[in-house]
Every structure is written in structure tokens, then in C-alpha cells.
């Protein structure tokens, strides 16, 4: 197997390939152009999107040429893959703004200065003539075959709109256009994209005669059953305005022990020998590996300086010392404080809990601290006098901490 593919396989990235042997031979012979696509369905990507872009970084390190494809066009349709119901149709203005923010996020992670492209499929999809598209592209698609793919089989029971049914044709056309424009030979995506990717490979092969390939990656899950990319605060976004760098660091710092080695392989560039060494211990000794994991992935997404700040803040929060300023904070407006504010109301306002009942349960269980002092009264109130130097420290359990600032 080709060296680049061996690296991906060893680190747990490979799931399915349209023809692994032929792809390996091609990659031994030349540096290929490959692409990863992502739709602009929200203002930020989350860590569930990171896996294909980690693969992109690995292949780029081996000299292969990446294309980041942002789905400014396909987002107008909505991918039914992995969805139980039709996606909400977004306004064009919202899609355009999402394209800008997602592009900015990815360019902080993927350096294209030495080769590579970032493209928006709206460039060729927005101007399509529907009749011509059906004649030039639709002719290569079998409805029977499309319905055999799991994406469509699942949705047929609950309803599949015609607009979503067109999505596979558009994604396949993307591959055809990238093959024609940039000599792209490989599409990479999550395993839920297998049907779309196979259809794209087939379209390129039949319409242009070019030999291209598709590669899918496993959908990553956590050993505790929680969905990858979800936390108590919701999605773990890559945008620091939506999910702080500190919380991003802490998400990886606090993963289950059983996931440490797997995530070190997936989310860092550490060598195999080092991963095996630091992940071979158990219990409290594994905390060092978790800190390394958290630092490395935070460095990839947010940069080394921000990773250092997050690491320093985490140590300051739980051991005392410098770094307090890097702990996330919530700005409490004086109008909310008035004479005083109930702690349970403050916890909801600061979004550390989702409801007052959850706040009360945490207080009753002894898991809430104000300036390192446990609070045992559900009716505990805070007033201006509590905010020494204009702030207090709110701690929930051992792992969640927030500065409340006036």
C-alpha cells in the first residue's frame, strides 16, 4: 500500500475506497489533486467536521494537492445524508455569509500558500440550465441504483423531497467539474457520503473517461455513547466566538479514558511510538496524554498561542496560579443584577445550565462553588458586594469554570 494510505490506515481513517489497489498505485506514481467538500449550513463548523480535514493535512504533508470545496451551491438544496427529515432551506444571504466564515476557519487550519485551492461550487452550480443539466448529467443516473443507497432507503419511509433527491447529482457534478478544471483524482468524505461519492466517481468515469477514486472515513463516536462534537453546551464549534478556545481545550482534556489513544491518532500528528508510549498508562497517569491531546488539537484549530493560553488557564483554574485572565467569562449587565440576583437565575443566564431545575439539582448535590466556596442553598443570592474587583468565579463540579464579570 502507498505510504500516504498506510499512514491513514494506521491512524484509523480508512473505511471504504472505490478501488484501493489502483488508488495506491496512482499515488505511488504521482502526487494527486484531491478534495474534501463541506456545505455552508451554519456559521461555523464543529469538531465532527474535522476528520476529513485532518486527512487533508496528512495528505498535504505527503505532497498531495488539496482542494477545499465549500458548498455555496449545494447548500441551497440540502444533503439528505444522515438526516431523518428535510433540512431547513436557508436564505441566499445567510449561505453567502456562512461560506465566508467557514472559508476563514478552514484557511486557518489548512495552509494553501504552497499549493492547493479553496473553491465554492456556486461558481458552476448557480448558473446551471436545468434542461441541459438533465440531458448532460441526469442521463448517467439510474433511479433504481440511487434508491439502493442507504441515504435514500432510510428517507423513503418518512418522506424524501424531490429537491433533496437532486442532491446526489449535484455533488457528483462537483467531482466532474473538479476533475475537468483541476485534474482532481480523489474525493474524500465521511462514510455517510458513500452513495454520493460512488455516484460522482461513476459520473466522471463515464462522462469524461478519466479514472478517479472515492475514499470514505469512519464516523467517529465516543466510548461513552455521546455524539462526537456535542457537549453540555451544545455543538463544539471551531469558531471561538461560539465556543471558547478554553472550552474547546477542555472538551478534549476531559474525554473518556478509552478514547485517548484513538483520538491521539486521529487529532494529532504525533508519531506512533510517542502515542503508544503516552497512552499506555491508566488512571490518573493518563491525564498527561489528555493534556497533550487537548493542546495539539487546539493548536491545529486555533493556533499555538491560543493553545498555550488555554492550557495555562486550565492549570490555573484547577491548581491555582497565573492564567486566570484566560478563563472564559460572562459579562453580567448591572441591569440584571439590580439589588441582587438568584444564583440559579445567574447560572441559566450565563448558560452553564439549561434550566433552573438543573441548577437546583447541582446545588443540592454540592457541585456549585462561588470563589471556591461550596454553595448549599438553592435560594442563594449575589449582590454587588460579592463581586470583589468586579468579578466572581463560578465553578460547576471539577471541570467547568466561568468568571462572572461586571
Swiss-Prot record:
EC main group: ligase
Disulfide bonds: none
Superkingdom of source: Bacteria
Intracellular or extracellular location(s): Cytoplasm
Keywords: Aminoacyl-tRNA synthetase, ATP-binding, Cytoplasm, Ligase, Nucleotide-binding, Protein biosynthesis, RNA-binding
Domain S4 RNA-binding: 341-405
Residues holding L-tyrosine: 35, 167, 171
Gene Ontology MF term list: ATP binding; RNA binding; tyrosine-tRNA ligase activity
Reactions listed under catalytic activity: tRNA(Tyr) + L-tyrosine + ATP = L-tyrosyl-tRNA(Tyr) + AMP + diphosphate + H(+)
GO cellular component: cytosol
Residues spanning the signal sequence: none
Residues binding ATP, per UniProt: 230
Predominant place of localization: cytoplasm
Protein EC: 6.1.1.1
GO biological processes: tyrosyl-tRNA aminoacylation
Pfam family, one: SYY_C-terminal
Chain ranges for the short sequence motif 'HIGH' region as given in the UniProt record: 40-49
Motif position, 'KMSKS' region: 227-231
Oligomer status and interactors: Homodimer.
General function of this protein: Catalyzes the attachment of tyrosine to tRNA(Tyr) in a two-step reaction: tyrosine is first activated by ATP to form Tyr-AMP and then transferred to the acceptor end of tRNA(Tyr).
Family: Belongs to the class-I aminoacyl-tRNA synthetase family. TyrS type 1 subfamily.
Protein name, entry field: Tyrosine--tRNA ligase
